[in-house]
């Protein structure tokens, strides 16, 4: 299995919350795990925000970032060009960074096909709108509409 993880799936690798066990399983089973270069800074922002949430006393963002770094070192990070992502935002009504995530996955799928890869690229997310857009773009998806 080759899995593309967006930021919502990647954060669940670090934080114990609904969907975390699924995300961790996908990450461990993926060979390789792939994500956009924007996932790292987005994940840092999300982890910082979660550490400030009520009920998260004792959450140490530094420990989460260390865990993020350990996992990020195992990710193939991909770039995307701006215009295709912009067209995806228009086509699917996506937020800008979600369009970049989907564009990165599409570019990855194209490269895998060019290289003759037989494995299917699965798109993992916990964002309902992004999952629906990925399905319309022909991806099999992993995740759930939790956000």
Segments (PLM) and residue ranges:
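Amphipathic alpha-helical segments within well-ordered protein domains
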Residues: 8, 44, 48, 86-89
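Short beta-strand scaffold positions
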Residues: 34-35, 96-99, 125
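Short, well-structured N-terminal submotif of metal-dependent ribonuclease cores
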Residues: 1-39, 50-63, 139, 145-147
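Alpha-helix capping/helix-boundary segments
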Residues: 10, 39, 81, 101, ...
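Acidic, PIN/NYN-like endoribonuclease modules and their adjacent C-terminal/linker elements
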Residues: 2, 40, 106-147
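Short active-site oxyanion
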Residues: 1, 30-33, 70-73, 118-122
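Acidic catalytic patch
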Residues: 70-92, 99-108
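Short glycine/serine- and small hydrophobic-enriched flexible loop segments
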Residues: 12, 45-51, 106-110
């Amino acid at each position: 299995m080759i899995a593309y993880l967006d930021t919502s799936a990647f954060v669940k690798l670090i934080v114990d919350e609904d969907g975390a066990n699924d995300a961790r399983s996908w990450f461990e089973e993926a060979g390789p795990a792939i994500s956009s270069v924007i996932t790292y800074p987005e994940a840092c922002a999300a982890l910082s925000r979660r550490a400030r949430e009520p009920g998260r006393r004792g959450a140490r963002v530094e420990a989460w970032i260390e865990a993020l770094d350990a996992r990020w070192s195992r990710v193939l990070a991909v770039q995307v060009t701006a215009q295709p992502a912009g067209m995806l935002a228009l086509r699917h009504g996506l937020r800008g960074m979600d369009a970049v995530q989907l564009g990165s996955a599409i570019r990855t799928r194209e490269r895998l096909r060019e290289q003759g890869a037989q494995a299917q690229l699965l798109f993992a997310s916990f964002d309902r709108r992004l999952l629906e857009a990925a399905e319309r773009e022909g991806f099999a998806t992993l995740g759930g509409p939790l956000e």
